[in-house]
Each structure stands twice: as structure tokens, then as C-alpha cells.
């Protein structure tokens, strides 16, 4: 019997949610995703010490540029060992500033191109705010493909699809966390609210012919992953990838394109904002996620400034 990881790869593109080059080399994902929190972890890995020194030297005291250069250097290193794409995140503090998001995204692509990496191997990650979705819509028109992250609500998924973004990252585990804390209940299998959210989005996209890729993210256990087997892509931590690799049990496909989905609805800005207002979980987790990424970005900047 093959491992659950190998079985999963038969019907889902497996992505590594890490900046750890050793883990990526060992687990052989197609793509990889990073974010400010993962870059902060990567900065603490001894193997990245020389790279940290180099980017700080190249940035000549510009801490913002040093952080961008570090993100791109980590991404470029990962691209040497995967066949697919790297997702690199825009500073979360810009999440409500469309012009600033556009400027930063273009700058990251320019840094990748300067490192010899074509833009078709990079996805720019943006938080799924209204402004982030609008920025993504413009970037897609410019040939810069995007990954809309911190996605917790159905309204966010609807707006992303209408904007023609390349990929969304709905967060399974954080939705589960919210409901578990809110209700005091334990959720398993198909009853998991995070699993239900991604399943609903996947079925809606397929039923309405959207090309936007659904990439489930933020998993707490392999049970959540098993329930979403068949999703376009799943981005998974090295720890859970290893558990799947070590498990020789059967893993059937659960999500399939033919399953019924809801009718298409195009949301205006006011409808989007109202839907978010009515979704306590989505609103709270989006705000919390932006705050956390912003704090880790600030920690990374401090690291760049301290060692400059």
C-alpha cells in the first residue's frame, strides 16, 4: 500500500507550507507557500544566517527592502528544489491600501526577476480584504498572478472568484479553532466547520465554472486533510506532510467537480462588507490574521535592523 501522501498526490496538488528548505527537499511538494510568520521562523534556521547577512548588506540600511530581499531570496532558494511556484506575501499592514498593495506586489516581482525568476513561477499573496481583492484583480490584468489568503468567509470566496484571482487559500484550521472556542464542542470529519467551508467554496466554484484554484490551508490534523482530498490544492505543514507520508492507510477522494453547488452571485462592495459584518467568525479571524502577520513582519524588520 502506498502512503496517504502519495495517494493524496493522485488527485490534489500538494503544496508545502514552510520556508524550511530541508523539509521541502525531503517531502517533494509541487509548490510552496510562505508568509511573514514562516519567514520569521526561517530567519532563525542556521542555514539562512549567511543569506540574512547578504540581504542586509545589499539593502544598505533599508529595512523594508531587506525584508523583501529576504523573502525573495528564500523563495528563489525554494524554487530550485520544487517544479512549481512559490507564494510570497505582501506586507499585511498594507491590507487596506490598494495603491500600496499594487506597488509592493510589483516591487516583489521585480526583485524576483532581478534574481532570474520569471513571474510565472511566483504567486503574490494578499489578504482577502476588499482592497486586497481589487488589487489582485488589477495585478491579474498585468500578468501577475495572485494568491488571496486569510480567507474565512463565503463572501470573500465569491468576491475573489468574480475578480478572476488565480488562487485562494481558505483557512480550515483557524475556522475550526474559532468554532471550537466559541461553542466548546469538538468537531471531526465532515462536521468540521473549516472542512464544510472549503467544501462549500469548492462546490460553488466548480458549479459556476470559475477557474480560480481552491487551495485549502491552515490544517490542525490529517483528518481535515483527508476530508478535503480532491481539492485543487492543499498547502500543508511539514509535520502533517510527514504524518501523511508515514501513514499507509487508504485515502479516498472526497471532493469531486460534479458535486452540486450554489447559484452564482456577484457581490457589490456594500454587499461584501455587509456579508462580512454578518459573519462574526470571518471578520474576527481576518482581523486577527492581519494583526498576527503584521506583528511578525515587524519582528522580521527588527531582526534586519538589529543585525545590520
Swiss-Prot record:
* Claim: Cell inner membrane is one of the keywords in the record: no
Entry's Gene3D superfamilies?
A: Aldolase class I (3.20.20.70)
> Catalyses which reaction?
D-sedoheptulose 7-phosphate + D-glyceraldehyde 3-phosphate = D-erythrose 4-phosphate + beta-D-fructose 6-phosphate
**Record GO biological process:** carbohydrate metabolic process; pentose-phosphate shunt
Query: Where would you say this protein principally sits, based on its record?
Result: cytoplasm
Q: Which InterPro entries match?
A: Aldolase_TIM, TAL/FSA, Transaldolase_1, Transaldolase_AS
Q: Using the chain's own numbering, where are the disulfide bonds?
A: none
* Class of enzymatic activity (EC top level): transferase
Which keywords, in A-to-Z order, does the entry hold? Cytoplasm, Pentose shunt, Schiff base, Transferase
**Pfam families per the record?**
TAL_FSA (PF00923)
Catalytic center residues: 125
Which pathway is this protein assigned to? Answer: Carbohydrate degradation; pentose phosphate pathway; D-glyceraldehyde 3-phosphate and beta-D-fructose 6-phosphate from D-ribose 5-phosphate and D-xylulose 5-phosphate (non-oxidative stage): step 2/3
The UniProt GO MF terms for this protein read: transaldolase activity
Q: What is its EC number?
A: 2.2.1.2
Q: Where in the cell is it found?
A: Cytoplasm
Q: Which PROSITE patterns match?
A: TRANSALDOLASE_1 (PS01054), TRANSALDOLASE_2 (PS00958)
User: What functional role does this protein have?
Assistant: Transaldolase is important for the balance of metabolites in the pentose-phosphate pathway.
Q: Which family does it belong to?
A: Belongs to the transaldolase family. Type 1 subfamily.
**UniProt subunit comment:** Homodimer.
What protein name applies here? Transaldolase
Which species expresses this protein natively?
A: Pseudomonas putida (strain W619)
